[in-house]
């Protein structure tokens, strides 16, 4: 896809990575990232107490050491090809923007909760802009789940294999109804 190719090219420009951080408040992680030399940012707000940071390899390593010293239960480097959802993906922006601009996007029947803003929208222009912004902006999954609950969602269904997102949702609100839907593909 255009997105994958553009991101791969951005990854090849500079060694970069991501790390999972467990057991610290968002503000502590953000402060340590800001205080670390080099590029390292909060990239995924997965659920309370679980973030992923993203950036230059030495900066992520230094942040992990500082996060461990600050009391993180874990600060674990992830086996990924780049610093996704960080400023290091900026070189991919133009190609992705061109691909998204050429795609047919119409107003959806129900609001789309995009995790750049954690807010619902039906505006095709906003949808396009946020699809591009997600390259360099953090995934605000925790905030998205909280907004969906506050907006009156009665339940959520995870589409695709596994139940990772359901598990994250349960860490925000254990009582909230979740389910999953998967289509089995026949082998040819």
Report residues per predicted region:
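Alpha/beta catalytic cores of group-transfer enzymes, especially the acyltransferase/condensing modules
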Residues: 1-137
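Acyltransferase/transacylase module recognition
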Residues: 101-188
């Amino acid at each position: 896809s255009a997105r994958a190719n553009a991101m791969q090219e951005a990854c090849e420009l500079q060694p970069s990575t991501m790390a999972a951080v467990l057991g610290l408040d968002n503000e502590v992680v953000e402060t340590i990232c800001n205080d670390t030399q080099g590029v390292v940012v909060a990239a995924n707000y997965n659920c309370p107490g679980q973030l992923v940071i993203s950036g230059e390899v030495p900066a992520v390593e230094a942040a992990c050491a500082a996060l461990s010293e600050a009391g993180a239960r874990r600060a674990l480097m992830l086996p990924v090809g780049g610093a996704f959802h960080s400023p290091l993906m900026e070189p991919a922006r133009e190609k992705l923007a061109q691909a998204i601009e050429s795609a047919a996007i119409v107003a959806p029947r129900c609001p789309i909760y995009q995790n750049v803003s954690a807010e619902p929208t039906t505006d095709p222009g906003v949808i396009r802009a946020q699809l591009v912004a997600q390259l360099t902006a953090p995934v605000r999954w925790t905030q998205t789940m909280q907004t969906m609950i506050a907006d009156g969602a009665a339940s959520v269904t995870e589409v695709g294999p596994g139940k990772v997102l359901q598990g994250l949702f349960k860490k925000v609100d254990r009582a909230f109804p979740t389910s999953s839907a998967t289509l089995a593909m026949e082998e040819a």
